[in-house]
Amino acid sequence: MSQKKIAVVAVGGNALIRSRDAVSLDAQYQAVKETAHHVVALIEAGWRVVLTHGNGPQVGFILRRSEIARDDVPVVPLEYAVGDTQGAIGFMFQNALYNELQRRGISDTPVSALVTQTLIDPNDPAFDAPDKPIGAHMDREVAEKLAASQGWKIADDAGRGWRRVVASPKPLQIIESPVIRRLLEENVLVVACGGGGIPVYRNQDGTLSAAQAVIDKDRASALLAQELNADMLLIPTGVEQVAIDFGTPEQRWLDTLTCEQAQALLDSGEFGAGSMAPKVEAIVGWLRHAPGKTGIITSPEAMGDAVAGRKGTRITD
């Protein structure tokens, strides 16, 4: 590969939906445009970028529409809904990134969104204990009614409302990582691993079959960073830094963490299971395989300053 460093940037599906009143595709595209502005700044700074994205709200919308229309059209299976979101969100990012590159006069960086599969174990215990939120936030009464009528599993999503939950097995391999590597060699800005990738398992004859599940975007992004030997894993989120005692008078923002410190905070239950914990876990897990590399958690608008060491929380081994 060329000497440019590789950054995997993992954008959450909720980052596309800024509020419960901003769920239209036009509103989501506006959010994508804002993120694209900050991602292209990394390109200008000399990074090669793979952008991954979540899809929790969006895949839930597809499934809900499918359930409403089930008497008229075939129901969309979960794995196909994940594929649908990879296409739709991938298009939004591909278009917005291309336009931002054009506006900045950067003509040597093509953009490509790649449908991506993620290998899982079909016997993963996650299938017996679904816990990955998808779809819109609801109040408890609405969620319980849908759980009763649709056979859903539901859970509180870090105090932000109730959501449907599905199985989220551990990602074992990003099937298309060799393709992503080749694209990076050609200086392509790649959009991949949408929604963590479409979960697939390997049959005895080597073929792949889809699984009814979703993959955690941060864990899949960490695995992709490992397979690409990336130099940085950057996870934009709703706050500029990681905090301890979040939401209390003792709240304290953290500029830096070592893996050991981060793991101790995870073990103590310091971070919310559905919010900051998966991001910190993903970076710590990646750094165990990537000594000397850097993980960063920050807000989208602070990404450039965070990479330069001026903002965000930097996690190192």
Language-model features: locations:
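C-terminal catalytic "cap/lid" subdomain
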Residues: 2-317
